[in-house]
């Protein structure tokens, strides 16, 4: 409730000169006090509050340097607040299904770091979440969950970042996706022991999936997500990270090389390499034995040894590719990039 505004005092007729000195001094003190009060109010705001954005409807966008995605099939039961940098918070009550998070508009081999809190009551996941196209795949690297631990067709395990993850594959039929209602596979890495915070080296999961015959296509978005289903709860997560996680990317000296999957056959596979940060670059690729490189395109290639490729631009742009004969080793090569 607000008090009724006081009536404005009318100015005395005939006064057109300056205010008396005592009145001017009182007015100056009032202005200083008001400025101090405004400053203190600003300082009292929680970090990021001045840049916070509340989201309650399905959308994607960019906020404070990070991509975000908000999707729900039950509007009105979940909301998110986009905080400073990679921070976001969620609150949901008796919801249907939702996925909310911050990350990157284009995923890939990244070393993702995150911290925060995750407090579900019912079925929910705290997960690195993303999509690829051609093939269309929805993937999860699950670090924490509520009452239900996701499962599926067991494909093996991968040990990375201080823990062991079980690998599963499932299929969804005529379900919502980034390409509309489609039938598509889901890939899962589910940590055996829950945690809320740490590092996720995505390339190690991608390599383990590939060894199990679970191939990704070209990356769409990737977010550190909170997902809930017929549950209630809250989360507050801050995400960060760098490109080149695991065996598939590297940077230094002003450029970064990032690997992504190409076509795959029984005995060999293609990798695409994208270079950013410079058009005058040198990429060094180290191939794990006994795998070998069969061919390359869009580069000038030299071979310091049978397991090392040095690639330089040949006028075809900043993207090139290689065909690798795996010889029983499906682990992707590592790459590093330097300018000049």
Curated annotation (Swiss-Prot):
The active site is at residues 138, 227. Disulfide bonds: none annotated. Its main location: secreted. Residues 54-239 form the GH11 domain. Pathway: Glycan degradation; xylan degradation. It is found in: Secreted. It comes from the Bacteria. Optimum temperature is 60 degrees Celsius. This is Endo-1,4-beta-xylanase B. It comes from Streptomyces sp. The gene is xynBS9.
């Amino acid at each position: 409730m607000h008090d009724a505004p006081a009536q404005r005092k009318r100015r005395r007729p005939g006064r057109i000169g300056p205010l008396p000195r005592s009145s001017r001094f009182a007015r100056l003190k009032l202005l200083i006090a008001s400025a101090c009060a405004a400053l203190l109010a600003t300082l009292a705001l929680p970090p990021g509050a001045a840049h916070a954005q509340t989201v309650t409807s399905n959308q994607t966008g960019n906020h404070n340097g990070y991509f975000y995605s908000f999707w729900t099939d039950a509007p009105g039961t979940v909301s998110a607040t986009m905080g400073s940098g990679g921070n976001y918070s969620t609150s949901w009550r008796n919801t249907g299904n939702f996925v909310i998070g911050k990350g990157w508009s284009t995923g890939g081999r990244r070393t993702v770091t995150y911290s925060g809190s995750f407090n579900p009551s019912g079925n929910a996941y705290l997960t690195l979440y993303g999509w690829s196209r051609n093939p269309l795949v929805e993937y999860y690297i699950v670090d924490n969950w509520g009452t239900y631990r996701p499962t599926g067709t067991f494909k093996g395990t991968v040990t990375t970042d201080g823990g062991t993850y079980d690998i599963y594959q499932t299929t969804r039929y005529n379900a919502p996706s980034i390409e509309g209602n489609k039938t598509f596979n889901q890939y899962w890495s589910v940590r055996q022991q829950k945690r809320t915070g740490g590092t996720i080296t995505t390339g190690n999961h991608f390599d383990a999936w590939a060894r199990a015959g679970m191939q990704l296509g070209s990356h769409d978005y990737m977010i550190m997500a909170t997902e809930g289903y017929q549950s209630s709860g809250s989360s507050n997560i801050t995400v960060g990270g760098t490109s080149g996680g695991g065996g598939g990317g590297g940077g230094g000296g002003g450029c970064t090389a990032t690997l992504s999957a190409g076509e795959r056959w029984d005995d060999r596979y293609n990798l695409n390499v994208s270079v950013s940060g410079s058009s005058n670059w040198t990429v060094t690729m180290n191939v794990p034995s006994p795998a070998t490189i069969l061919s390359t395109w869009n580069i000038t290639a030299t071979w310091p040894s049978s397991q090392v490729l040095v690639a330089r631009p040949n006028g075809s742009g900043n993207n090139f590719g290689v065909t690798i004969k795996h010889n029983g080793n499906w682990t992707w090569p590592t790459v590093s990039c330097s300018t000049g």
